[in-house]
């Protein structure tokens, strides 16, 4: 391992994750034109952000960096795959891993896996429907579109906010930080779908100031205790989201993990590990 990589990993354990993220969140909400314009311009140049797809294409027209970062796209920018039964990719990014959930563990990187039960907040009953199922992990890079959409239509059953660390998420940390995705702060959303139970886990990372959902708004920042909110109670109006509907967003981004139960879906040949994907592309089909 290169010395600079060793230093980076050491800094991940030493850094005050949540303080850094809160400070970044304050800066990202700054409305002072000179400051926010400098931040946006530097970001666009560094990461080569394609603004031609954005609903508002002038990057300096946004009031804050966060508004720019969570920009909406033109209606025609992400057409949804029309194959019957298609399960869609929920976000722009790259497939970092996908495959079966084996012995209650999800593959992270060579030599590393993490607990399905821990990922979903530590409740074995919550994890049970996904034992022996399938997962896909999608990493959102800084230049990507950072809104997350439904892979298929679903009715919300439960949302769980799991506090945790905020390690950076990238190939280096995935390879060297054990249980990375089950240690970082995350929001797990469980749905009932035509393919059975589905979970979408939005994982935070260093400088991810907040995670929001379409129905609850701001879910993070950091709280000390796991919070689970049921949405399938008789007293509550059901929350149903159509295929392709927006379900959440990152203010600065990280990772989305999609889970299905056993025998429900098969990943298509289209997504490949480390390969780029776009929201709305075909990700999986129902198993025969």
UniProtKB/Swiss-Prot annotation:
Q: Which InterPro entries match?
A: PS_Dcarbxylase (IPR003817), PSD-B (IPR033177), PSD_type1_pro (IPR033178)
The UniProt entry's GO biological process terms, in alphabetical order, are:
phosphatidylethanolamine biosynthetic process
Name the membrane topology term: Peripheral membrane protein
Catalytic activity, EC: 4.1.1.65
Q: Does the keyword Transferase apply?
A: no
Its annotated pathway? Phospholipid metabolism; phosphatidylethanolamine biosynthesis; phosphatidylethanolamine from CDP-diacylglycerol: step 2/2
Which superkingdom does the taxonomy of this entry point to?
Bacteria
Protein name per UniProt: Phosphatidylserine decarboxylase proenzyme
- The record lists the organism as Bordetella petrii (strain ATCC BAA-461 / DSM 12804 / CCUG 43448)
């Amino acid at each position: 391992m290169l010395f600079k990589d060793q230093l980076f990993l050491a800094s991940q354990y030493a850094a005050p994750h949540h303080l850094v993220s809160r400070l970044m969140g304050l800066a990202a909400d700054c409305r002072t034109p000179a400051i926010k314009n400098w931040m946006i311009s530097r970001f666009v140049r560094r990461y080569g952000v394609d603004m031609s797809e954005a609903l508002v294409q002038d990057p300096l027209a946004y009031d804050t960096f966060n508004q720019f970062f969570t920009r909406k796209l033109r209606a025609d920018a992400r057409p949804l795959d029309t194959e019957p039964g298609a399960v869609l990719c929920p976000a722009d990014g790259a497939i970092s891993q996908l495959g079966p959930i084996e012995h209650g563990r999800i593959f992270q990187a060579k030599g590393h896996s993490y607990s399905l039960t821990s990922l979903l907040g530590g409740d074995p009953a919550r994890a049970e429907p996904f034992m022996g199922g399938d997962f896909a992990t999608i990493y959102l890079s800084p230049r990507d579109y950072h809104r997350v959409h439904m892979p298929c239509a679903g009715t919300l059953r439960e949302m769980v906010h799991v506090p945790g660390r905020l390690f950076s998420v990238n190939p280096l940390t995935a390879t060297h930080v054990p249980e990375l995705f089950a240690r970082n702060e995350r929001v797990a959303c469980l749905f009932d779908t035509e393919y059975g139970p589905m979970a979408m886990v939005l994982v935070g990372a260093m400088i991810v100031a907040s995670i929001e959902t379409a129905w609850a708004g701001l879910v993070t920042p950091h709280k000390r205790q796991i919070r689970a909110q049921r949405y399938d109670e008789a007293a509550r109006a059901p929350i149903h989201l159509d295929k392709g509907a927006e379900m959440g967003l990152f203010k600065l981004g990280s990772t989305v993990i999609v889970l299905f139960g056993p025998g429900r879906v098969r990943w298509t040949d289209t997504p490949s590990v480390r390969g780029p994907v776009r929201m709305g592309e075909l990700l999986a089909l129902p198993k025969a």
